[in-house]
Amino acid sequence: MRLSSGGTTANMSTKLSSRKEKGKRLERLIAQRINDVLGGYGVTAKRMIMSGAIAGWKGDVFVDGLPVSIEAKNQEKINIWECWDQAESQAGLGKMAVLVFSRNFNKDPLTVIRFEDLLTLFELAIQAGWVSHIRKGRRTIL
C-alpha cells in the first residue's frame, strides 16, 4: 500500500519506530547523566514510559529529589517554541520546566530553561559557594 508521502506503510512504521527509539535514547542519556553527576546527593532520575502517562507523571524524565520536569527532543529539526510550550504545560506548578534537545546526536544536547530560573540557579550557586569554582574554570556545577 502506498501513502501520499511516497512511502509504504511498513516504511512509515519503521520511520516512526526509529524516531521513537531516538527519543528513548536521549531520555535514557539524560537520566543516566543525572544519576552519574547527582546520584551522590540523593537525586535519582529515570526515563518515564509513555512520557509518564501511566504513573500520572508528566515529562519524559522523572527526577526524584529536584522540582523539575524534563521534556526531551531528539530531532533533526525542532520548533523550539512548540516544544517549550509542551515542557511548560507538563511542568505545572512548582516545577522548573526543562527542555533538552539534540540534533540526532550530531552534537551535545542543549538545554532551555526560563531566564528567571537561570537567575535562580546562579543565585543558589553563589549561596552554596560554587562561584569560586566557576571562576577557576572548574566544572563542578551540575
Q: Predicted regions span which residues?
A:
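Catalytic phosphate/metal-binding cores of nucleic-acid and nucleotide-processing enzymes, i.e., regions
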Residues: 1-142
